[in-house]
Design a protein with these regions (language model features):
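Active-site diphosphate/adenylate-binding microenvironment
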Residues: 65-146, 151
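Thiamine diphosphate
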Residues: 25-26, 32-34, 38-42, 112-216
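Charged, low-complexity, helix-prone segments enriched in Lys/Glu/Asp/Gln
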Residues: 54-79, 145, 181, 187-199
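Short beta-strand segments
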Residues: 1, 19, 104-106, 157-158, ...
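Beta-sheet entry/capping signal
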Residues: 14-15, 100-103, 153-155, 179-180
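Glycine-rich, acidic loop regions that bind phosphate or pyrophosphate groups
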Residues: 1-61, 197, 212-215
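General structural feature for long, well-ordered alpha-helical segments within catalytic domains
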Residues: 11, 19, 36-40, 44, ...
Length: 216
């Protein structure tokens, strides 16, 4: 994502946007390419021919990647906190995973943590549903991924809100002998949706367990 455009602070940057929809491709004054992403990238590669970025630019990218990895390792490393953060939980699983393990996530704050901390070491080992915060896709999607990759471990990161929405597919995975590793993190309910609700001027409406109208 753009980080509310904080990722593009250089006033001289140029944006090339590939999209099947002309309206979306032209947003933010981008140089538009209307077409399928894979086909468009292949044609762009052919058009570029032997062109390469400068060695100075390659060095900068390597240095920035090294700095980023060091930062992520530090922030997601072992902790003495009474309760580990999302970053600590994802980091612990990542460090103990195999390169072929597949990570799945979809909704809430876990998406942001997983895409930063889970740095794939093999192709097709990271599935994240960004688009519309598809709560509970983490479970049904993980089941489908396991069915397609029976010889790999599938690890899905789930908040308690998504878990309550669609835990029945965990049962489906068990009875069909499709093993899943489900990491359920306590978020007190749908905390991210609650935050969005409040930031837009609304009031809490049964998003958090503590503010829901439940009997004792």
């Amino acid at each position: 994502t753009t980080g509310s455009w904080s990722n593009f602070e250089n006033p001289n940057f140029s944006l090339v946007s590939i999209n099947v929809a002309r309206f979306d491709a032209s947003k933010h004054m981008a140089q538009s390419i209307i077409g399928d992403a894979k086909v468009s990238l292949n044609e762009l590669s052919q058009a570029l021919g032997d062109w390469k970025a400068s060695e100075e630019w390659h060095k900068k990218s390597r240095d920035e990647l090294k700095s980023w990895n060091e930062y992520v390792d530090k922030e997601s490393g072992p902790t003495n906190q009474k309760l580990p953060s999302y970053a600590h939980a994802v980091g612990a699983i990542y460090r103990n995973s195999d390169p072929s393990d597949i990570a799945v996530t979809a909704a809430g704050g876990l998406v942001g943590e997983v895409v930063q901390i889970w740095r794939p070491r093999e192709l097709n080992t990271h599935e994240t549903e960004w688009g519309f915060s598809c709560m509970s896709y983490e479970i049904s999607g993980a089941l489908g991924i396991k069915m397609a990759n029976p010889n790999k471990e599938v690890i899905t990161f789930v908040g308690d809100g998504s878990y309550l929405l669609y835990n029945s597919d965990i049962y489906s995975s068990v009875i069909t002998n499709n093993k899943l590793i489900v990491i359920v993190c306590d978020n007190g309910g749908h905390a991210v949706i609650n935050r969005l609700q409040l930031f837009k001027g609304g009031k809490e409406f049964n998003c958090l367990f503590e503010s829901s109208n439940v009997s004792n």
